[in-house]
């Protein structure tokens, strides 16, 4: 966490050197010597230099016509200084364009006369130093935070941390948090219960599967969750119990639908399940994924039917 920012003048010798020359780029003075004393090979064309004068750049020798910028092919014989990088020769302008420092926000070149803000390895124009999310400019003394290579104000950084704590407790899921920073549409929150909260919910469910509002509010205060989350959990739990009971009833050998039997039909049970399922899916908070009704084997259903339910056509 950074609590203030550094203002750096690129005219200073320390940063002036960094901006104009870095990573092997070496400014060299171009000197000329007489070629009468010894023969030299041109580093540009590879031919023997027989001219009256030899142009030297560091340890290399050039013809006057061969000493050119590798980018724009400008003749450097009339310049007092050039730049060498990875065996290539550049004029000052092209070297700045290719290897000069750039503003992190607008990506334009930083000039030696610019006043810039430096944050770790990043550089910003004074007018470009602002929050990546809300675009609010920073002033001297303002608190800012660096996350994923971007600068955020305190409020936006707190929002990112809260989102990471609620939706992604696992630090290995940091990539998901990064993608959510630039989302335009909000994502539905998902509540994950810990072991203590699950035990409290199960204990309350054993007492009553449909607790009153007062009990739900008390349970919400004890667990630190909202009343709506508590209500959704009980709805999901009742739906699961109902499904398991229905599955056991369909697979049991003693369960039979006689002419005088009481109870709801299969259509009534499916309709009730669909109704409760719709209530769960319309909630804004998701506690656990609700399960759909199980599939009943038609052969097993036929096996459980009594003879009075099976129609035998009369044959004369």
UniProtKB/Swiss-Prot annotation:
Q: Where are the transmembrane segments?
A: none
| Cell compartment(s), UniProt | Nucleus
Residue ranges of the LIM zinc-binding domain? Answer: 40-101, 102-163
Top-level taxon of origin: Eukaryota
UniProt xrefs under PROSITE patterns:
HOMEOBOX_1 (PS00027), HOMEOBOX_2 (PS50071), LIM_DOMAIN_1 (PS00478), LIM_DOMAIN_2 (PS50023)
Sorted alphabetically, which keywords does the UniProt record give?
Answer: DNA-binding, Homeobox, LIM domain, Metal-binding, Nucleus, Repeat, Zinc
Q: Where is the composition biased (Basic and acidic residues)?
A: 246-256
**Which SMART domains would you find in this protein's record?**
HOX (SM00389), LIM (SM00132)
UniProt GO BP = axonogenesis; defecation; detection of chemical stimulus involved in sensory perception; foraging behavior; negative regulation of gene expression; neuron development; neuron differentiation; positive regulation of gene expression
Q: What protein am I looking at?
A: LIM/homeobox protein lim-6
Q: Which organism is it from?
A: Caenorhabditis elegans
Source taxonomy = Eukaryota, Metazoa, Ecdysozoa, Nematoda, Chromadorea
What's the gene?
Answer: lim-6
């Amino acid at each position: 966490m950074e609590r203030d920012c550094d203002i750096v003048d690129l005219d200073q010798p320390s940063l002036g050197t960094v901006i104009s020359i870095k990573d092997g780029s070496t400014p060299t003075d171009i000197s000329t010597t007489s070629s009468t004393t010894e023969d030299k090979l041109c580093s540009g064309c590879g031919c023997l230099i027989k001219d009256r004068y030899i142009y030297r750049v560091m340890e290399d020798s050039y013809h006057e016509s061969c000493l050119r910028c590798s980018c724009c092919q400008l003749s450097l014989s009339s310049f007092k200084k050039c730049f060498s990088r990875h065996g290539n020769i550049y004029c000052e302008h092209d070297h700045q364009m290719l290897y000069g420092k750039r503003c992190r926000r607008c990506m334009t070149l930083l000039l030696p006369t610019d006043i810039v803000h430096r944050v770790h390895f990043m550089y910003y124009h004074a007018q470009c130093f602002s929050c990546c999310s809300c675009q609010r400019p920073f002033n001297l003394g303002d608190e800012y935070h660096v996350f994923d290579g971007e600068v955020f104000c305190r409020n936006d950084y707190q929002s990112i941390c809260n989102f990471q704590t609620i939706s992604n407790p696992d630090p290995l899921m940091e990539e998901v948090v990064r993608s959510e920073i630039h989302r335009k549409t909000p994502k539905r929150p998902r509540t994950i219960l810990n072991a203590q909260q699950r035990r409290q919910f199960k204990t309350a469910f054993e007492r009553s599967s449909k607790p009153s509002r007062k009990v739900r509010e008390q349970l919400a205060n004890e667990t630190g969750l909202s009343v709506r989350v508590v209500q959704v959990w009980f709805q999901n739990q009742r739906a699961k119990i109902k499904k398991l009971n229905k599955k056991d009833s369909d697979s049991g050998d003693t369960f039979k639908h006689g002419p005088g039997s009481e109870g709801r039909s299969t259509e009534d049970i499916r309709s009730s399940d669909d109704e409760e399922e719709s209530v769960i899916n319309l909630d804004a908070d998701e506690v656990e994924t609700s399960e759909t009704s199980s599939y009943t084997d038609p052969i097993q259903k036929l096996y459980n039917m009594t003879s009075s339910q099976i129609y035998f056509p009369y044959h004369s």
